[in-house]
Amino acid sequence: MSTANRLATIAGQVSKAIAPQWPLSQWIAVNPFWHYRQQPVAGVAAHWRYSAGTRLLMSPDFYWQQWQQNRIDAALVTNKMVNELEQRSLLKAQLPQWRNLSRLVDKYTRRRRKMRWNDEVVLQISQTCGLFMQFPTRFQQAGKDSSLYQHWLTISRADRGIETLMDEAELTELFAQLPDDPHKLIQVCHDNFLSDASDYALRCYSQALISDLWGWAAAFSYQDARQDSQWVFELLCIRLAWEYILWQLAERTNTKVYQQLQQALSAQVENCEGQVAHIEQHNSLLWQWQAAYERSQLNRLQFKSDTVEESNAPDVQAVFCIDVRSERYRRALEQAGKSLGSYVQSKGFAGFFGVPLAIQRKGRDVPHVPGLLQPAYYIKAPARKQSVGSLLSNMFNAPVSMFSGVEALGLSKLKSLLTGVPGQLATANNAYIADGSICEHNGEASMESLVGICQQALAGMQFTRFARHIVLVGHGSHHSNNAQRAGLNCGACGGQTGALSARVLVRLLNNQNIREHLREQGVAIPDATQFHSAMHETVTDKVIWLSNTVPDSVKQVFRAATEKLTQACGESEKDRKTRSGHWAELRPEWGLADNNVLFFGQADRLTSADTIGSNFLHDYNSINDPDGELLAQLMSAPGLVANWINWQYYCSVTEPKQLGSGNKLLHNRVANDIGVFEGNGGDLRQGLAWQSVHNGSDFVHRPMRLQVIVEADEATIQRALAKAVAFNELFEQQWINLHRLNARGELCPVTTPVTAK
């Protein structure tokens, strides 16, 4: 295969390996390195550290600080590790990094009072991408799909401002001479400056180029997966085209710089593999400290020995859609029940209560399922007039529109605008939809299908007995003027709350005909048992009732839990509500910050109080799962979702410049909410705002890989791993850590990963 073809192939591979970023309104947390899960995390970290400067480890200073503050157990480190880390923290050694031609030109030229080339390249491409997504039909050719490369080329050839801004008279001619086809561009670049590059060097270069526009690449990856396009590949070609322009510009105008570029590029091509190996060896010490740090935090968890299950039936059972914030509420609810003389049992269950729904609205489906799944059923949403509140919300969600909104409404409205838009609490939405007919794509769902939904949901919840009252509790959050607010509803829910799913499943489970069919299948729900739906509003910890028949005795327990949490946080419910509705609030809530543990087991075995709010708790009883089938399903669904959430937070801490979204104060929505700029330029940002992981003085999210704990024997875990291919890849390559909880309450390593077939 020729070098040019190899470059095209490798550029295509690098493009396809970019993880998607969902639009703001459909937010789903994503592991940016999801497509690298089959490779060891240490190797991927070293490769991206060299190619793009991306950090998947904290600095030596961080680990040294944790050690000095006794946050890392002495038993987990050696004297050699301590001495080497101290030297690292003092020396501040710089690691080698690939430099694109734009950065090399900036290094070798003196551009006093002029914009740096790399900054202009990123800005120009980014602004062009924004126009492309905002007005796609303007750039379509007759009878053809939109071409990002053609769109950029058309704008660049017509824009004389770049030539003036950069004070380079050759640019117009150079743009005019660029090939019209991205594959031909690759051929030209190969012939001019990449003919001697190895596959390894081409991969490093491609990753370095795409990392300059990683946010846009992630957004286009989402689009490419849903349509027949190659926008990520075209974006990489656009970035490569700028490299070719700067190469030619140096050749025409500055012989010295041109020779320096040749020498520097040649050295990088020749040495890149050795440089990556050097970084991996250098990082090995930090990976040891990272492992010690993670284990030290994990050691704070305390588990009690396996005990006999409570013999009395619960008075109330509350099934929460799993979330680190619901863990706090579950503990408070069970304690409130005890204080009121009521036995309350809480459970954790992922995935919108197992109801794979979509709402059909205005000709399109709005999924109410985790991002990794597809809806199997849908409910048609009836037409509804838009409320004043939603109109105002739309007005003020538009970029830079708050000022025009104040002008239109008058200064008398400024106070109300700064405390939020009037209207229904977002978490109580979709009430009018839940009673609609549940349909499959060939018509209304059959009784058999509806029974199947209920049967699967109940099997996942693993009820051994039914309380008189069972509450399905979804979660959501409400705050204003936050571009990333959908991500705080849930890290995996596409911007949706659990309200609709809870309502629909409760409706089905209370249906007598469905119960009769369930009884025939061996699932006997007592006649006295009633299901209710509710919503945990995570900012105020208030529970919003979605059912109309909830007894006061049940509501009383939930009120007591909310009061308990309000007292514990030292902030009144009113103050929290005010904070969440304030337009200038940078930290309306912490979302899923500090998530670090996923526990499949009996939640009451976890006894440590100081770790509450960091754990995803999903009920699981291995006694009822001898072949590991259910555990494999849990690993393959909530297990992967938790990895995505955890790695988005992790990367927002370790690499906030590339994989975080910067300062929330400066967020500006872009192109129909495809993402945000920080200010008015640079790359589209991805990941979380700095204010979502840092409180101004310290991190509120500890940078830990997900610690998965399973309450099961080794054989059951191995059987599940053999079926959960992607989860097993994450485990084998150390993207997650896996532990087994034994009957004595001890955490044991799962020592024998199976190779997925």
Swiss-Prot record:
Instruction: Give residues annotated as binding Zn(2+).
Output: C321, D323, H475, C490
Keyword check for Metal-binding, yes or no: yes
Which UniProt keyword terms apply here?
Cell inner membrane, Cell membrane, Membrane, Metal-binding, Transport, Zinc
Cofactor section: Zn(2+)
Location(s), subcellular: Cell inner membrane
Q: Give the record's GO CC terms.
A: plasma membrane
The protein's topology relative to the membrane is: Peripheral membrane protein
Tell me a Gene Ontology molecular-function term this record carries: zinc ion binding
Query: What is any Pfam family matched here?
Result: DabA
What the entry lists under InterPro entries is as follows: DabA
Q: How does it assemble?
A: Forms a complex with DabB.
Q: What does this protein do?
A: Part of an energy-coupled inorganic carbon pump.
Q: Which family does it belong to?
A: Belongs to the inorganic carbon transporter (TC 9.A.2) DabA family.
User: Which HAMAP family would you find in this protein's record?
Assistant: DabA (MF_01871)
Q: What is this protein called?
A: Probable inorganic carbon transporter subunit DabA
- Source species of the chain: Idiomarina loihiensis (strain ATCC BAA-735 / DSM 15497 / L2-TR)
Which gene name belongs to this protein?
A: dabA
